[in-house]
Amino acid sequence: MNSKAFYQQMFAIAIPVALQSLLTSFLNTLDTMMISSLGDASIAGVGLANQVFFLFTLICFGINTGSSVLFAQYWGVRDVPQVRKINQASLMLSTAISVAFMFVAMLFPYGILELFTKDAAVVQAGGDYLRVAALTYVITAWSFSLGSTLRSTGNPKVPLVATMSSFVANAFFNYILIFGKLGLPAMGVVGAALGTVVARLIEIGVLVFVIKRYQGPLQIPIRHLQKIPKEFWTVYWKTTLPVIVNETFWALGQVFYNAAYAMVGTQATAAVQIAVAIQGLAFVIVRGLGSSCSIMLGQSIGKNKIDRAKKDANRFIILSIITGVVIGAIESLTPQWTLLLFGHISPEVYTLGQQLLQVMGVIFILKTINSIIVVGVLRGGGDTHYGMKLEMSCVWLVGVPLSLLAAGVWHLPVTLVVICAGMEEVTKVVVGFYRVYSQKWIHRLVQD
């Protein structure tokens, strides 16, 4: 594939994915912006409550990205029956996980918040939000599965349209429900949760509406689920289970990081939530690159074009370095501008937010490279077992222990706790580069 064809295919996938990620990330930022006027406790409470949603979505992400490894290779040879089976399996697993998370979050919202903090105001705000927001979990799981299938089969614009609809609805309903407009009572954090529920319903409605008119691998009667043969499940679990385990334990690691930040204090927690929301906006380009990388490499390997896959992997690695440096520098050098989005935060949280963004901008460079290596190259090449071992070891043997020691034992300020957590990325980038250039990451899963 020449350079022009490479970039055309990359942008065709990356731009819709990046735009969808931008809207999704801005939804989270919008929630934080609106809630910021309610005080530090509300920001911290909603941020900690969303750790449950974060863990849940990462498990769903694992199910769907693991499935997309098979999607890409089988779609590369247009094996529609296998693609349908993969879609069935991912929908079934995502639904089961979402129901479990929904019931736990609805039944024990305040107990979950108390695992992070003993601040009564934070627990109250977070618990109130979590009990209502849990209603979105099943809907979100379906949106993830259907959107992932559409992207992997060459239709990234459909989930983008659905997310745009959700974004507009969330902004509108959040505004009227949080602050009590159009004759409605002001509901605060509960209003933010209700706004999210309505937005998710609209998103899944758009997806289902389009899919009913889409002649392809998504039109599958539910009764076909029982016809999936044992041989398929063997291949499916071999590829997807490492990704599911990877994302689950990586997400748990992020939850532990937030627990460490909460040890520093409520203002530190609020500042971290704001900084993470801002960085989430910057990370959308990386998500687009990662999706392009995984799908393009998977399709090339499925077609047995191994040399093309190797060459494209190197191109994506170079792009990740350039992207990380440019965006990381902007993030580090402009915190005073990005924090203007949050006009009602306390001076202490504002100062901490500036310091955190400067530090996180540097770490962002490594996060970008690692995302392309793990999510793009290793998963696109079917090297999911190695990716799992790499991420789990770096999170649980490096990042989590250091951050907990920094906050709970050494009592360091939150900026240094974030740096300790960032040691995960330093370790990962060294080992990840070695794996990519060993060329042991290429695994062809399609049987001719």
Regions found by a protein language model. Give the residues of each.
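Generic alpha-helical transmembrane segments of integral inner-membrane proteins
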Residues: 18, 22, 26, 30, ...
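Interfacial/gating helices of multi-pass transporter permease domains
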Residues: 35-54, 120-125, 189-190, 231-239, ...
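Transmembrane helical elements of multi-pass membrane transporters/channels
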Residues: 12-28, 132, 166, 199-203, ...
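Small-residue-rich hydrophobic transmembrane alpha-helices
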Residues: 43-103, 140-159, 258, 271-335, ...
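Short alpha-helical transmembrane segments in multi-pass integral membrane proteins
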Residues: 1-17, 71-136, 186-241, 297-363, ...
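Helix-terminus/linker motif at the lipid-water interface of multi-pass membrane proteins
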Residues: 22, 26-44, 113-120, 176-187, ...
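Short runs within selected transmembrane alpha-helices of multi-pass transporters and secretion channels
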Residues: 64, 133-152, 159-170, 192-207, ...
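Transmembrane alpha-helix boundary and packing residues in multipass membrane permease domains
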Residues: 17, 21, 32-33, 69, ...
